[in-house]
Structure formats: structure tokens, C-alpha cells
């Protein structure tokens, strides 16, 4: 088994041990060093391994935001200097590289991660060093660290609206398919609680390791269970194999629609639009989202990386993270961690998905939920939205059916 595909439980244990060891050699100063003509910032994503299909373009979007900030004069009169590291789809590596960025490179903040396993591996590193991580991807909720800002959706801004949409469409029998690590298992625990309270039935639940590419057995079980819909929490390039297997088995989106929460435009391109057109996704941003800020973002991304490139929700959330951090630093007048945290509370910016506001109570952001339908050209057409940004509720305190989940 490759290093990137270790058991998530073993990997997380190793990551915590590494973080403890790193912490014993001394803590970095809070907020990093901003001496000289530049301010160093860390960019930490999987540039290799099974998660590279998703994370490389998040890095690209964050670097674009850094370039735009520098072109406008920088922050506090200084240019931003990105220090890019590869988490290699391996959770202990994320912990190691996070510690390096903080203590050796002395960055002011870090933008990074995708999987919840990588985030949980990094969390103790940032908390011990009192340094800030800006995490750009939707996740399962039930977490709120004082040293993480979460610019992707939490559960009540993505998974719950996705379930609401299925229920409103009359889909009562649901089959759960996910990768075998913390996000899908926790998300499905939440989904099962929702289903029990809302007259839905879970007719199957299957997990496969990250990087898994053989889905004939899972697809056969889908055919036998005959659900009204599939809720998909697979991550990385496993989605390519899964949707190809679905199509190969003759299972159509009309007969058995799949709602995915980790498949966006970039993944659609990798899967092949022919294999996924007609299926649903739940996010907060699409390349087709209307608005001048998004038109500018899409044009800038294509100008920087190529006219054939697409934008997606995690990319946009990574881009937003850089802009929000820069606004907080400008407001604070320093890169010092506690000052930036205090300044970030309530900051609102007009960003590609719309107005994004940081909730000072939990360091998540208000986000509009959007359900989309994958089109034959690989773009995603919005078919429903929440009408206004939803206040983040990472512990689902506003839902009686979620009592006892946290």
C-alpha cells in the first residue's frame, strides 16, 4: 500500500505524534515574520497522489489571489511571497509540512488542505504554534478551532440543503457511497440522522479507500438496492472510476440520480462530462454563478492558466481565503495572529460567489447553498439556491434531529 493510502486512523495517529514531536522543539512566533520587503505565506496542498486531481487547481487559485494582491500594492506596503509545499495526499506529510512552514519558513499564515483527514492532521500543529490555517473546502462540520478559518461550506450549507432538495423531489430511498475516512463517515452519520427524522430510508452504505478504482461490486449493489438516489462522498480520482462504472452498467441519471459533494467542474473534466452529465452536485459556487465579481475571477483565471481551464467551488473558496486574510491583516495593521483573528470578525467582501461574511462566533463564513446539474459540456447549471447566505452552524445546533451527533 502506498504511503498516500495508509489507513486514515493510523495516519491521523502518526500525524498527531509528529505534531507533538515538532512542538517539543519550540514554537514559532505568532503570525510569522513580516520583516524585509515581503510577507511569507504558506500554500499547502496535495500536488501529487490521489488528491492532486482536486487540489492542484486550488493552489493555482490561491496563487492568483496572491498575484492580484501584489499587483495592487501588497499588504501593509509589502508584497506577499508564497511558499508552496506538497502534502502528497498523505496526512502525516501535511502535519510535517505545516510545521516546516510555521517554524522554518516563518510564514504569516497558511492556506491549505482538502480532505478532513489532512485538516485534522494539521489542526494540532496550528493550535500549538498559535498560527492560522485558512481551510478552503466544504467539510462535515462538528469542529471549530480558534486557529482555523473555514472558507468552504459546513454541513448546514451543503449537505443538509442537498438532502432537502432530494426530499422535495420525492426521493425517499437513498444509497450512501463514500471514501473510507473521516469526512464521508461523519457526513453519512449526519445523513442517517436526517433521514430518520424526515421519512427517508438509507438502503445501502459502502466505503472504499481513497484512490480506489474498481467499482463493479459497489455498482452491482446499487443495482440490487434500486435506490431513488445516491449520495456520493467519494473524494479524489475514485470519482472517475465510480462514474465510469455507473455508466458502464447502464445506470442513468434519470433512473438513479447521484448527488455529489466533492465533484466540481475540475473533477467533471477528469471524469468526462459524458459519464456524469445529468447528475447533481451540491456546492456554493459554480463557474456559471452570475455576477460581475465572478466574471472578473473567471476571466483572470483563464488568462493566467489557459482558456480551457475551469473554475470551481474549492478553487473559489481558496481564492476567497487569501482575499479575506489580506483584508483582516490590513484592518489589523499587523500579521500577528490574535490581532488578525479579532480583525477578521464580521469582515464582508464582494467575492465571486457573492457577498462573503466571516462569522466571528466560529470563524466560518456565511454562504449561499446551490444545487447544480452537470451539463454535457462539463459546466454546471444551477437548479436551486437558498436565496440568501446561510449562517454557518457547524455543530447543527439549529436542528433537533442532530442532537447528540457532536
Predicted regions and their residues:
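Beta-alpha junction/loop-to-helix N-cap segments that form part of ligand/metal-binding clefts
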Residues: 28, 32-33, 53-58, 73-142, ...
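Solvent-exposed, acidic/polar segments of extracytosolic/periplasmic ligand-binding ectodomains
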Residues: 351-406
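Extracellular/periplasmic Venus flytrap/periplasmic-binding protein
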Residues: 96, 140-141, 146-249, 288-296
Amino acid at each position: 500500500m502506498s504511503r498516500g493510502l495508509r489507513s486514515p486512523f493510523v495516519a491521523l495517529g502518526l500525524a498527531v505524534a509528529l505534531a507533538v514531536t515538532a512542538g517539543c522543539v519550540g514554537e514559532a512566533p505568532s503570525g510569522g515574520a513580516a520583516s524585509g520587503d515581503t510577507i511569507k505565506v504558506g500554500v499547502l496542498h496535495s500536488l501529487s497522489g490521489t488528491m492532486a486531481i482536486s487540489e492542484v487547481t486550488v493552489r493555482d487559485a490561491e496563487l492568483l489571489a496572491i498575484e492580484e494582491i501584489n499587483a495592487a500594492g501588497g499588504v501593509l506596503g509589502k508584497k506577499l511571497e508564497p511558499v508552496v509545499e506538497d502534502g502528497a495526499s498523505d496526512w502525516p506529510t501535511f502535519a510535517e509540512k505545516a510545521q516546516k512552514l510555521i517554524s522554518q519558513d516563518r510564514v504569516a499564515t497558511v492556506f491549505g488542505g482538502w480532505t478532513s483527514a489532512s485538516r485534522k492532521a494539521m489542526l494540532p500543529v496550528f493550535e500549538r504554534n498559535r498560527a492560522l490555517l485558512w481551510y478552503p473546502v466544504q467539510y462535515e462540520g462538528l469542529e471549530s478551532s480558534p486557529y482555523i478559518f473555514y472558507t468552504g461550506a459546513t454541513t448546514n450549507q451543503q449537505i443538509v440543503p442537498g438532502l432537502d432538495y432530494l426530499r422535495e423531489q420525492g426521493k425517499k430511498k437513498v444509497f450512501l457511497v463514500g471514501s473510507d475516512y473521516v469526512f464521508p463517515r461523519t457526513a453519512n452519520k449526519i445523513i442517517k440522522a436526517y433521514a430518520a427524522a424526515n421519512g427517508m430510508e438509507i438502503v445501502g452504505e459502502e466505503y472504499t479507500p481513497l484512490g480506489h478504482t474498481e467499482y463493479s461490486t459497489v455498482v452491482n449493489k446499487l443495482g440490487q438496492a434500486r435506490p431513488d438516489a445516491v449520495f456520493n462522498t467519494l473524494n479524489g480520482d475514485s470519482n472517475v472510476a465510480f462514474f465510469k462504472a455507473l455508466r458502464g452498467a447502464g445506470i442513468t441519471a434519470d433512473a438513479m440520480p447521484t448527488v455529489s459533494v466533492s465533484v466540481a467542474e475540475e473533477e467533471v473534466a477528469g471524469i468526462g462530462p459524458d459519464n456524469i452529465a445529468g447528475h447533481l452536485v451540491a456546492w456554493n459556487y459554480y463557474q456559471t454563478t452570475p455576477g460581475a465579481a465572478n466574471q472578473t475571477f473567471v476571466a483572470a483565471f483563464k488568462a493566467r492558466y489557459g482558456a480551457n481551464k475551469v473554475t470551481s467551488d474549492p478553487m473559489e473558496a481558496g481564492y476567497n481565503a487569501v482575499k479575506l486574510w489580506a483584508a483582516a491583516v490590513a484592518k489589523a495593521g499587523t500579521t500577528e495572529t490574535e490581532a488578525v483573528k479579532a480583525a477578521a470578525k464580521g469582515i464582508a467582501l464582494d467575492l465571486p460567489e457573492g457577498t462573503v461574511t466571516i462569522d466571528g462566533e466560529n470563524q466560518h463564513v456565511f454562504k449561499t447553498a446551490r444545487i447544480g446539474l452537470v451539463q454535457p459540456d462539463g459546466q454546471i447549471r444551477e437548479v436551486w439556491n437558498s436565496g440568501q447566505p446561510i449562517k454557518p452552524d457547524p455543530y447543527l445546533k439549529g436542528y433537533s434531529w442532530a442532537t447528540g451527533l457532536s
